């Protein structure tokens, strides 16, 4: 009988104890005591079709150190906070990734998925609301971006009046040994004009009248190259590869696999899809201000996401700088 | 077999293995191949090059992050839409090499497979030729020494593992608690699997339920327990345990009470394994969702537990195990191969023993829960090795014997049509799983997984037709050819069909071994991480949570699979010859064995082609 009692006890432990232990572990009873001033937040990362971030909005108080425990529900995701200079973490399916973050100021932060996870990948964004000590969630009015300051319509077509037949080369432009006019040597001013306009400006200038069209284009390429730095191009390439290449393609031709679902012909018979940055006829017709505007605001209805809450201003300029490398040979 | 004949076979076998290929070598070229991954296939699914060629692999992904890990090469790439990967290698070795996804990409991730075929595919042609040589050799094998009536004589009579009545093993088996303890521990694992399946991550290869049921348990069952110990699993299976404890109103001890059950008798017309055949086929139709979705696995486990418990309250003994368990059916069939058996030492002792304690039970042991009277037990199939009879027998007449592999298959009597279909269904399923789950055809996997869609209905119909009509039809045709001369004798064909079906057992077990090697060696390493973090909740119980996926022996898998298949073929053809002699009343009758042997060879060649073919 003693054997039987022992057996009953063991069976009870297993039938009741095991589920209870699992429940207790889930409820955090075995977790180490939370560090003072630290808050643990559980987050589920699922593709947008599977629910996206759960929860989508997290509200915390300023001053708390946040330890986000992110469970991967389906495919590989990544977690990052927009406009914060913290490396993203990879969230693998069936595992838990940790991301530690102390919000520096009250306000709304956007967290987003950094790994292409679905055709709706870019919709996988959530909001972190950091409330100040006074209990207020500030909503600052940001400085309007350049395209708004200039009053540009970034949805208007920008077919270039002039565009190069061959890829312009900054090296060949350099070899001409000619000085650039002052307005084209100023990076700030260059952002407001298109390569097409710059070409027209040089073409009309008697100082360059002896040059052929290709040579003028080489000078345009030189001006564009001088408006950036190798570091910014590298930064821009990294951002482009992480966020843009899935649709626009690693080669910039608009042929990335993520863009296939976006390719369609509209009612007017115009085919739509991710922009092809190597197509000089359209690329040379836009200015950096327009392209930055498209990056910030996205293209309503075309599938182009808005990157305003995610990229810093510096990052948006870097990625636009990188886009020119598809038109010009630096 | 005469020595000369054996020598010829040996020389031929060595020849196909060692003779260098005579094909003219082609000049090595360079191939640039773009492989695009998308859930859950590679495009192209097959890369064909010649030996010595340089391959530049551009690996891209169209949907989510995927990997490409090439068997036999140190090559593991990762791609995401917008980030392609590139690798270069020289295809030094000929043969077929699978490549598989190395980044968890969704439910079917473990089955996302493509293949590199390096021509000339010597390994495949050598294996195929070896299969033919071994098949022909086994066909001529006449079973060695024969007794006067022409029946095959066992080399040695079965030898009990109990050397003396006081053997430690015997005393251990008579103890009740070790077996109970093991069952209870497995029940704990079972409950953990159900909890993990229902509450844990839905990512199959990170969930204890999927990894421990379909990789660890399955691999252990089909590769080790069944071929070497028959129904040993059944003796500690946790599924019928709660029902049996309720029936007995005791956990470990012998209560001496009447079984607590309505005590209904199982309908006579269901006292066979037709329900098990149907149950297995039903589950097999949903195999991809079942194998990849933890919640479905958990619900099926739970359903089996409830069914077993419920039935034990209505019917006497273990009706579920004997007549319903979808696993028990094939375990019992393949247990006939095991070199281990529970039998009585002397049937005369049982016949004259009036108490029949082994069947009705006494204070030392319960009556056989499996409806078996050990005194008339001749095959492993119905015996669950629970050892109650060994404990109950007051005359120490129940023993565990060691015996040659497949000893049960040599006897003619006792085989039934339901078992024939079990053998056919199991063989067909092993071939189909090798193609659907481990083959490079993404559309097939997608159709099998998209339950209740038109594509799945097509797959299900084809699956059922192959299982229930095509393969049985072809096998019946082969048997009919063997028995052509007595095609007008009523009932003869059916008897021969059932009798020849024994060849399906070594053949099917070999097919499942080949399939399971490909599943278990590749995915076994998931077990460590799943043990450390059974629910995918970020636990790290033994510090193993971050053990990466490491496929084992990938360069060797096709060879091991081919060895299993050719071994199974040799056993099946040898058995076909033995059955032909039985049918011919002991006369040498290799022509009678020929059609069925060709059937076995055909199935083996199909399987060889699936695992290593060009």
For every predicted segment, state its role:
Chain A
Residues 35-65:
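N-terminal edge beta-strand
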Residues 136-178, 213-239:
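Electrostatic cytochrome c docking/interface patches
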Residues 8-10, 15-37, 92-165:
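Extracellular/periplasmic metallocenter environments
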Residues 207-232, 289-299, 308-330:
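C-terminal capping alpha-helices of c-type cytochrome domains
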Residues 117-118, 175-185, 203-207, 247-253, ...:
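Detector for the c-type heme attachment site
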Residues 61, 106, 162-182, 231-254, ...:
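Sequence/structural segment immediately N-terminal to covalent heme-attachment motifs in c-type
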Residues 55-58, 86-90, 99-101:
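Beta-strand-rich interaction surfaces with strong enrichment in secreted/lumenal proteins
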